[in-house]
């Protein structure tokens, strides 16, 4: 007779309750948004608190062009006289040189690259910090929560079995020279002899 292993199939969901970051600013923000989440009972503050606890790899950066596209979709339906919503990113905001003109955006993020900050303020926008956001919108009213792609890292492209049919994983190649092509699809004329 077999044994019914019911506990094996259950996957333990890992939830972070504290940060591993040594950054004092992030630690203060975690305290602030934990307090706001309890006091205001708003899901926005609870979500910000949850994202602040994440590791750096899970706080992916986002480009200015992506923010501009997302905000354009939201501001189409705005009535005249209403202020545009604040884009909230728990991560870094990076510049995108492919976008020549940037609209006036109000963005709150953990960090802005130097060129991104210059372009936002030059277009008539605002670069806000999370403590300023807590004063302006303590319940998250008139805000739009955005995040970058976590799968944008180079290491993610190698996840999976390379060479398996249907897999798009990149193989780890030790050398990329013409004479030493060691990847799965090397040319036979230049194979290692």
Swiss-Prot record:
<feature type="region of interest" description="Disordered">
    <location>
        <begin position="158"/>
        <end position="193"/>
    </location>
</feature>
<dbReference type="GO" id="GO:0003723">
    <property type="term" value="F:RNA binding"/>
</dbReference>
<feature type="compositionally biased region" description="Basic residues">
    <location>
        <begin position="183"/>
        <end position="193"/>
    </location>
</feature>
<dbReference type="Pfam" id="PF17135">
    <property type="entry name" value="Ribosomal_L18"/>
</dbReference>
<dbReference type="InterPro" id="IPR021132">
    <property type="entry name" value="Ribosomal_eL18/eL18-A/B/_CS"/>
</dbReference>
<dbReference type="InterPro" id="IPR021131">
    <property type="entry name" value="Ribosomal_uL15/eL18"/>
</dbReference>
<keyword id="KW-0687">Ribonucleoprotein</keyword>
<dbReference type="InterPro" id="IPR000039">
    <property type="entry name" value="Ribosomal_eL18"/>
</dbReference>
<dbReference type="GO" id="GO:0022625">
    <property type="term" value="C:cytosolic large ribosomal subunit"/>
</dbReference>
<keyword id="KW-0963">Cytoplasm</keyword>
<dbReference type="InterPro" id="IPR036227">
    <property type="entry name" value="Ribosomal_uL15/eL18_sf"/>
</dbReference>
<dbReference type="GO" id="GO:0005737">
    <property type="term" value="C:cytoplasm"/>
</dbReference>
<dbReference type="GO" id="GO:0006412">
    <property type="term" value="P:translation"/>
</dbReference>
<dbReference type="GO" id="GO:0003735">
    <property type="term" value="F:structural constituent of ribosome"/>
</dbReference>
<comment type="similarity">
    <text>Belongs to the eukaryotic ribosomal protein eL18 family.</text>
</comment>
<dbReference type="GO" id="GO:0005840">
    <property type="term" value="C:ribosome"/>
</dbReference>
<protein>
    <recommendedName>
        <fullName>Large ribosomal subunit protein eL18</fullName>
    </recommendedName>
</protein>
<keyword id="KW-0689">Ribosomal protein</keyword>
<dbReference type="GO" id="GO:0005730">
    <property type="term" value="C:nucleolus"/>
</dbReference>
């Amino acid at each position: 007779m077999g044994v019914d292993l019911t506990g094996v199939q259950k996957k333990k969901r890992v939830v972070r309750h504290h940060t591993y970051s040594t950054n004092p600013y992030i630690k203060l923000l975690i305290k602030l948004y934990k307090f706001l989440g309890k006091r205001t009972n708003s899901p926005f503050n609870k979500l910000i608190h949850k994202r602040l606890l994440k590791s750096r790899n899970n706080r992916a950066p986002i480009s200015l062009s992506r923010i501009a596209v997302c905000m354009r979709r939201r501001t189409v339906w705005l009535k005249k006289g209403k202020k545009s919503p604040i884009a909230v990113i728990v991560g870094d905001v990076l510049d995108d040189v492919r976008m020549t003109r940037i609209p006036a955006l109000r963005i709150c993020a953990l960090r802005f690259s130097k060129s991104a900050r210059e372009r936002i303020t030059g277009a008539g926008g605002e670069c806000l910090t999370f403590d300023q956001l807590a004063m302006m919108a303590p319940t998250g009213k008139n805000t739009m929560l955005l995040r970058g792609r976590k799968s944008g890292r180079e290491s993610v492209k190698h996840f999976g079995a390379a060479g398996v049919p249907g897999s798009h994983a990149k193989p780890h190649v030790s050398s990329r020279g013409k004479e030493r092509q060691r990847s799965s699809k090397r040319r036979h004329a230049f194979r290692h002899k």
